[in-house]
Each structure stands twice: as structure tokens, then as C-alpha cells.
From Swiss-Prot:
Family: Belongs to the cyclic nucleotide phosphodiesterase family.
UniProt GO molecular function: 3',5'-cGMP-stimulated cyclic-nucleotide phosphodiesterase activity; 3',5'-cyclic-AMP phosphodiesterase activity; 3',5'-cyclic-GMP phosphodiesterase activity; metal ion binding
Protein name stated in the entry: Probable 3',5'-cyclic phosphodiesterase pde-5
Positions with a binding annotation for a divalent metal cation 2: 504
Length: 728
């Protein structure tokens, strides 16, 4: 019977094959080998590679044992065999060995004649799993890159093999050194020193993020370890002042004879300065090359004056640069090794150390710079706070003015705030606060006056979004709360009134779109509702000033709740948010599911109330409405002018050249935003229907003006057409 017939028979009788494979006729070792071959074949097909199980999966490993013994002095070959072993154990050829040494990372490949070739890695492929191999000093000497998925068991196998391999590599190197006549104790000491260096480098890294107090603290740490690292008697660290071509040190021993070089810098700190053209440290700073001098007095760059003054004898010097991105930022000079001269090993150790201490010095320098900037910022903030809060004379002047117990005219939306003087507005703002909260909230009257006056001072003198507008919106909320006293809790009413008074603090007369388009600093701080978030932060800043916290009598919980409500209310004045709030409320009201006691419904109601009060000019008597619209559009035109100056075309509403379209634009604004807002408020609070009625009246008046303007435009166009015909 030929092979084909046997294969056909087995395919037709799979149960017979299965029974035979799992029977005692097949040894466990053979079964396992078959399973490995099957797994490897599956992985190779999946990854588009081919290959067998390999010598490492065979029962007899004597050949591999001989290879390891014969190549024990060849680290690269040992690492290659480890890689092949790992690949064959988990059944994949999709692996790559990356060997690391002082010159960089190299990919290891086996040529057709069996030789190993190293190729510099420029760009590494993305591996599914990377297993590192480290030496006794915990330094990475190789990586095995797997370009196939490994499960947890396979990863454990690879990790175990590489752990044993790392230990084997150590003993292999130890054996090689002994064969060459090296002292094994030296190797142990070298490994201990490497471990010590690694631990310190970790310590330096920690200090960068945790222990940085000042540049001086980091310098002392660097000097102390540099001295211990190479077993030097003394160590000095000089920083480079490239602007003045000098090196300087702030940490020094005045007993070394350097007193004549001591200067006091602009910050009142003592420091030693030398020209970079002088001395050994200057040479290293200028060239970026390290110097290992066995006899200082034989080097012409050495200045022996210091020794003659102090009686100290300099013998050996190791002077090394500290670099960041190839630029020398400092120089460490180590003097007189305790035992002999500085070695190449000392130089190598310091080169590694220099990378980390360069990073530490760089961060410390940044820290010092940030700390100085912070101090300047605090001074500036202190000066700003002084000039942005009201003074004692203003407070005393307002305190002395007597006011009626009740001002009935303030309780209607029709009240004209434009006729109030600059003194009366804050006086009436205080009155409205007291009227609303005198019976339910403990507050200091002087703090309240101070708060209101400072709020006034922090509104900018722009055409519309100024103190007069803030006062008008607060008055609208006052009138609304007086007409619906039970609609909100006292904390909610407090948040609503304070929010209205402060809702446009520090407004610059430009909208959010302008802030984002022009990439202003505020737009970089806040991603959404730019100005509204700034207004809220300004409110909090004022509340935090001494003698301004009108909420200080609240409990901690109530204070947090009130601040949260103030933030919610001020952000709600962003008209971009109104449309989603309107849509949600309309659905709730249309479905007859509105419940003022539900938190979600209350927040939506408060948001729409804020919008209604912010737009209150559209619900004022016609004469107040027209006067307000003039200043609104003047501010719009100012923004449009600024946009045009920067090369951008403003929208028609902000284009001064489209001023004749004002009535038509107002109709769109009144019908598209104002009326829907007041319709919602009237559905929730029928007593506040007057705002809707007044807004409807004003909208019709604007429609009449828009129609008149349209007729004028048509007549003018007709006249121009007739004139052109006459000329022809």
C-alpha cells in the first residue's frame, strides 16, 4: 500500500486516527513534540512564515550544549541561541534579536554560511511583544522582538528562559575573565559599582520630580556624588553663561583661595566667575571635550595660584562636560583621586552620570525660573488686586446714604436703569440683595457694599457689556424673583441674583467666536464658553478677596452648592447653550412631564431664566429698547472693525457697512431667540408673562421699521434704475 492510499484511508477514518494518537502506543514525549509542531505550523501560516520546530525542541540537546560551550566567550552568539530557543519553544519564526551596546542598537541576522551579522537599527518595526535581557548590573543588553501575539503562558516561558540566560551570561563573562587572568573580585566590584551608579541615577531621576527645591540643592547633590563616583578628594561644578562667555559657581568652599573671584550677582547671591578662555574648566566648557590630567602641574592650562595661596596640592584632575542636546551647560571638575589616577572606567561612569545630572540641572534651572516667575506673578497679582478692588472711601460714602425701606418701582421689569447715577446703581444693587435675603441669610453689610462696588470696578468700559448691563440683568432677576417668591429655594435665588450681577465681569466687548478665531489667551485657557467661564472665575476671584465674601456665613456644603449653581447660571448665559436648553424644555412641557421639583427640570428652568434676564432689553419699553440696541450694535461694529483690520470679513450683524439692515437683523434676533425664550418662561411662570408681551410688542415695532427700510431700499433702487436709463 502506497503513502497516498494510507493518507486517504486515515482521512476517511478520523476516529481511528484519534484513538491511535491518544492511546498508550504514543509516548507523552512524542505527543508533546507533535503538539508543538502543530502549534508552530499554525502560527507560521497565520503570520505568513514557514519553519519547523527546530533543534531546541528535540529530545536530544547534546548538539546545542556543545554549541553553547564552544561559544561561551561570544555574547552575541549566546544571545542568538537564546532567541532561537524562545522562538522554537512557542512555535514561531517571527522573531528578531536586537543587540544593544555602547554604539547603539543592532539587529542580529544569520547569513547563509552560518555567520552572525549585526546591522544598525535606524527605525524599528512595531513588535507585538518585546522581551528584554539584562545583565547583572540591570542594564539591557538585548531585546527579543516577537511579531506575533503571545498568550500569558508563552510570555512566562520566554521570561523564564531569558532570566536564566541573563544569569548564564554573567557567569560566562566571569569565566572568560578568569581564563584571561582577570581577578574575579574586580568583576564583582565593577558590577557592584554599576549597581550603585544605577541606584543613584534613579535617585537623581526622583529628585527631578520630587526633591527639587532649588538649583543649589541639585548642584550640591551632583557634586557630592561626582566626588564619590570617582573617589576624588574634591569636586566643583561650574555652570556655563554662554551670553558672557563665562563659567560660574554658586556652591564653593571659600577656604580654597577663590575669594578674589567672588562676586555678588543681580539676585544678591555670591558666585565665582571665570572667563571660558581660562583654566581647565574653561577649556572643557569651550570645547565640550573631557580632560583626564595625570599631572596638573605639567599642563599649561592649569592655574597653580590657587594651590600656592591655600597650600593645597593638586595632582590629578578629571574635568568632564555636562551637555543638553549637544550644548555644554556645565562642567564638573574632580581633583585628586585618592588611589592613583583617574581611569578610563571613571570617565565612562561619569559620561553615563552626566546625562542624568544634565537633565537634573536643566529641570532645576527651569524650576528656578518658574519660581521667580511665580514670585513676580504674585507681586503683579497683589498690585492688580489693590487696583481692582474698591477703596474704603467708596464704601464709607455708600454706607452713609439712606434709602427707603421699599422701592416699589424696582419690582417691575419696566424700570429704566439708564436714568440712575453711578452712585445709585450700586446703592440699588445692595438694596435688592437685602430685600431678597435679609430675612434668610446672614451677611455683613460692609462686605456686601464692598462686593458690589468691586464688581462694578471689574466691568470694563465697553459699549454694552458693562456695569450698566450687569446691573440691568440683576434687576430683571430681582423683579422675577419678587413676582415668583416661592419658585426657587433661597440658595438658588441667591445664586441666580449674584450670577446676574456678575455674569459679564471683565467682558472685552468681543464674543466667543472672536476669541477663538483670534487665538486669544483666554481661548487657549477655555475650550468652550470662553467668556462665560472667565466671568465665573472673575466672580470667584472677587469672592476670595478680603472683606468681599458675601457667602461666608453659609455652611461648607451650602457654600459649595451655591458656587456650583453660580457656575451653572453664568455658563447658561452663553447663547450657544440656549438652543439645546430650549429644545429639552419644550419636549418636557409638550409631554406634560414638567416637574419643578425635579433637579434636572429646575436646572433647565434656571438656565432659561438667566437667558431671559440677559436679554431683558428686548422686553423693556420701546424707548429703552431702542436706546439699548444702539449701544449693542456699536459694540458689534467695534468687533467687526477689529476683524476687518485683521483681514477677516465680519458677519452682517457686526459689519458697520450693513448698518441700514439693523431693523431686519433685530427682527430675526427677536423672533429667533428672544420670543422663544419668553414663551418658555411664561409657560413655566405665568406671572412673568409681561416679558413675553413686551417682547412681542417690540418685535412688531422692529418689523414695521424693517418694512419701511425695505420700501426705502426698493424706492432707491428704482430711482437709480431710472437715472441710469436717462443717462443711456
Amino acid at each position: 500500500m502506497d503513502d497516498a492510499s494510507v493518507l486517504k484511508y486515515l482521512q476517511e477514518n478520523p476516529k481511528l486516527v484519534e484513538d491511535f494518537v491518544v492511546s498508550n502506543e504514543i509516548s507523552p514525549e512524542t505527543f508533546k513534540r507533535w503538539a508543538v509542531r502543530r502549534t508552530m505550523k499554525y502560527k507560521n501560516v497565520k503570520n505568513g512564515t514557514s519553519g519547523g520546530t527546530g533543534a531546541w525542541t528535540e529530545p536530544d540537546l547534546s548538539m546545542k550544549r556543545r554549541v553553547i560551550l564552544e561559544t561561551s566567550d561570544n555574547r552575541t552568539r549566546i544571545l542568538y541561541e537564546i532567541t532561537q530557543c524562545c522562538g522554537q519553544l512557542i512555535g514561531t519564526n517571527s522573531i528578531e534579536l536586537i543587540v544593544q551596546n555602547d554604539e547603539g542598537a543592532f539587529s542580529c541576522r544569520k547569513t547563509e554560511n552560518g555567520e552572525l551579522k549585526l546591522k544598525k537599527v535606524k527605525t524599528s518595526k512595531s513588535a507585538d511583544y518585546i522581551q528584554t535581557i539584562v545583565n547583572a548590573g540591570n542594564q539591557t543588553i538585548a531585546e527579543i522582538h516577537f511579531y506575533t501575539q503571545l498568550d500569558s503562558t508563552e510570555k512566562s516561558i520566554v521570561n523564564a528562559v531569558c532570566t536564566w540566560a541573563a544569569a548564564t551570561n554573567y557567569y560566562s563573562e566571569l569565566y572568560t575573565h578568569k581564563q584571561e587572568g582577570s581577578d574575579g573580585q574586580d568583576i564583582h566590584e565593577n558590577i557592584a559599582k554599576q549597581r550603585k551608579l544605577s541606584n543613584f541615577l534613579l535617585d537623581v531621576a526622583r529628585s527631578i520630580f520630587h526633591d527639587i527645591v532649588s538649583m543649589d540643592a541639585v548642584i550640591i547633590k551632583v557634586m557630592n556624588f561626582a566626588q564619590k563616583l570617582v573617589d576624588a578628594d574634591r569636586a566643583s561644578l561650574f555652570l556655563v553663561d554662554s551670553k558672557n562667555a563665562q563659567i560660574y559657581a554658586r556652591i564653593f568652599d571659600v577656604g580654597t583661595g577663590d575669594e578674589e573671584h567672588v562676586r555678588v550677582n543681580s539676585e544678591g547671591q555670591k558666585e565665582i566667575r571665570f572667563d571660558m578662555s581660562k583654566g581647565i574648566a574653561g577649556y572643557v566648557a569651550s570645547t565640550g571635550e573631557g580632560l583626564n590630567i595625570e599631572n596638573a602641574y605639567e599642563d599649561e592650562r592649569f592655574n597653580a595660584d590657587v594651590d600656592s595661596k591655600t597650600g593645597y596640592t593638586t595632582k590629578t584632575i578629571l574635568c568632564m562636560p555636562i551637555l543638553i542636546r549637544g550644548i555644554v551647560i556645565g562642567v564638573v571638575q574632580m581633583v585628586n583621586k585618592h588611589d592613583g589616577v583617574f581611569t578610563r572606567q571613571d570617565e565612562d561612569a561619569f559620561e553615563i552620570f552626566a546625562v542624568y545630572c544634565g537633565l537634573a540641572l536643566h529641570h532645576a534651572k527651569l524650576y528656578d525660573k518658574i519660581r521667580r516667575s511665580e514670585q513676580k506673578y504674585r507681586v503683579a497679582l497683589e498690585v492688580l488686586a489693590y487696583h481692582s478692588v474698591c477703596n474704603a472711601d467708596e464704601v464709607n460714602k455708600l454706607k452713609k446714604i439712606e434709602i427707603n425701606n421699599r422701592i416699589v418701582e424696582l419690582e417691575t421689569i419696566d424700570f429704566n436703569g439708564m436714568r440712575l447715577s453711578e452712585l445709585e446703581k450700586p446703592l440699588y444693587a445692595v438694596y435688592m440683595f437685602k430685600t431678597l435675603f435679609a430675612d434668610t441669610l446672614r451677611f455683613d453689610t460692609e462686605d456686601l457694599i464692598r462686593f458690589v462696588l468691586t464688581v462694578r470696578k471689574n466691568y470694563r468700559r465697553v459699549a454694552y457689556h458693562n456695569w450698566a448691563h450687569g446691573w440691568s440683568v440683576a434687576h430683571a432677576m430681582f423683579a422675577t424673583l419678587m413676582n415668583s417668591p416661592d419658585a426657587f429655594t433661597k440658595l438658588e435665588a441667591l445664586a441666580l441674583y449674584v450670577s446676574c450681577l456678575c455674569h459679564d465681569l471683565d467682558h472685552r466687548g468681543k464674543n466667543n467666536a472672536y476669541m477663538k478665531t483670534m487665538s486669544t489667551p483666554l481661548a487657549s485657557i477655555y475650550s468652550t464658553s470662553v467668556m462665560e467661564r472667565h466671568h465665573f472665575n472673575q466672580t470667584v476671584t472677587i469672592l476670595q478677596q478680603d472683606g468681599h465674601n458675601i457667602l461666608k456665613s453659609l455652611s461648607s456644603e451650602d457654600y459649595k452648592k451655591t458656587l456650583s449653581l453660580i457656575k451653572h447660571c453664568i455658563l447658561a448665559t452663553d447663547l450657544a447653550l440656549f438652543f439645546s436648553n430650549k429644545a429639552k424644555l419644550n419636549v418636557i412641557l409638550d409631554n406634560n412631564t414638567f416637574d419643578i421639583n425635579r433637579q434636572e427640570h429646575r436646572l433647565l428652568t434656571q438656565a432659561v431664566m438667566m437667558t431671559g434676564c440677559d436679554l431683558v432689553a428686548s422686553a423693556k419699553p420701546w424707548n429703552i429698547q431702542t436706546e439699548t440696541v444702539k449701544v449693542i450694535f456699536e459694540e458689534f461694529y467695534d468687533q467687526g472693525d477689529a476683524e476687518r483690520l485683521s483681514g477677516k470679513e465680519p458677519i452682517p450683524m457686526m459689519d458697520r457697512q450693513q448698518a441700514h439692515m439693523l431693523p431686519q437683523m433685530q427682527v430675526g434676533f427677536m423672533r429667533g431667540i428672544c420670543m422663544p425664550c419668553y414663551d418658555l418662561i411664561a409657560r413655566i411662570f405665568p406671572k412673568n408673562d409681561k416679558m413675553r408681551e413686551r417682547c412681542e410688542y417690540n418685535a412688531k415695532k422692529w418689523e414695521e421699521l424693517a418694512e419701511e427700510q425695505r420700501k426705502k431700499q426698493e424706492a432707491l433702487a428704482q430711482q437709480n434704475g431710472e437715472a441710469n436709463e436717462t443717462q443711456e
